[in-house]
Amino acid sequence: MELKRVVVTGLGAVTPVGNTPEEMWQNMVNGVSGAAPITLFDTSLFKTKFACEVKNLNINDYLDRKEARKMDRYTQFAMIAAIQAVKDCGWDLEPEDKNRIGVVFGVGIGGIKTFEEEVSYYALNQENGPKFNPFFIPKMIADIAAGQISIMYGFHGPNYITASACASSSNALADAFNLIRLGKANAIVAGGAEAAICATGVGGFNAMHALSTRNDEPEKASRPFSASRDGFIMAEGAGCLILEELEHAKARGAKIYAEMVGAGMSADAHHITASHPEGLGAKLVMQNALEDAGMKPEEIDYINVHGTSTHVGDISEAKAIKEVFGDAAYKLNISSTKSMTGHMLGAAGAVEAMATVLAVQNDIVPPTINHEEDDKDPEIDYDLNFTFNKAQKRVVRAGLSNTFGFGGHNACVVFKKYEA
């Protein structure tokens, strides 16, 4: 069976550094940090008092006020990113076979804020008996984002969410890619969403010592591959990519951002939260993705790394890149856009895949910000080009994006310039 080709024809973004793909990309290229003191809840008793929140977004510009109230914040973000992407791809939905358009979204945590609110209310009012919002469960469940998007557009194709912690939306893209190239769908609205900046989310990650506590200078806290890194920054938002079968896209005259050519998956099988210290899972997933894409290491010009600004994770990923790419590792560009967006958890893969697509399209590599020349970790090879502090113009023939999740879940997606 000949596999079909898959292209990216639409983008949507709700992020801490911009609420459209254009705004997000411009701020990434300019090295803008989305970190600031948390406004979504009172952090006075918390170790970490800052995060990368979505700012200046009017939900009601996109969603009916009454309907939006029935959704958790993460679902609102997913809906808005999908609305942008569907509009961007230029679909005339009237003649489309909606039975062959699906929705696959990645969600790592889901409606944790809704859960927090409902359980807190119950705990404070137990003597009055159980009283819950009738929308509690449909707001909270992780699959509802994909369901709501399909309901909005009437898409009857494959519809589900993927949940693999921080790799969730990369897995969603991988699944969407495979569904299309196997002929199971003409197009998939694929992406990820997360909104876990609440007392439960931040408190839980603080208890694990996973978050940076650089409260005096939040915008400088995420510093992947620097010796002084002290954990990641919680972030929220959503990213959406329209993946479409090539001939279907050409037939309707769609613009094409890039071609998706491969996806890899692997497991560390090592620890519930820590990366394998030698980067075993990271090595396997990049090898799998390159094999799936039919590409050699020297054909990759850019890696958007997982790069969360954690001690073990950054070291192990850098080791894995050297092992997989050999001499070619020193010729490509590496960057962590999490240094600007923070860690968007289940949405990270989609937003970082979008950054990779835009790097391929525009021949610009966004930077890894916050590195200082004298802040070098002896366990990291700085002959690798981490694109520190300033975007770099270069031809980007192809790029890959890594995401690694708690539980040892690893996913990698590959995009290249579209050639007819």
Identify the residue ranges that each predicted region occupies:
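Condensing-enzyme catalytic core mediating Claisen C-C bond formation in acyl metabolism
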Residues: R5-T9, A36, D216-A293, Y302, ...
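Glycine-/small-residue-rich "gating" segment that lines the acyl/pantetheine channel
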Residues: A123-N133, A174, N178, E194-A251, ...
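Conserved beta-ketoacyl condensing-enzyme motif
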Residues: V8, E23-M24, V32-S164, A193-V202, ...
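Conserved small-residue
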Residues: G10, M28, A82, V103, ...
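ACP-dependent fatty acid/polyketide chain-elongation machinery
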Residues: M1-E67, C89, E247-E259, M354-T368, ...
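Flexible, low-complexity linker/loop segments at domain and module junctions
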Residues: M1-V8, P95-K98, A293-E299, Y330, ...
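Active-site-proximal alpha-helical scaffold in enzymes
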Residues: A78-W91, A145, S150-Y153, P158-E194, ...
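Acyl-CoA/ACP chain-elongation machinery
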Residues: T39, K184-D230, A263-P277, G307-D314, ...
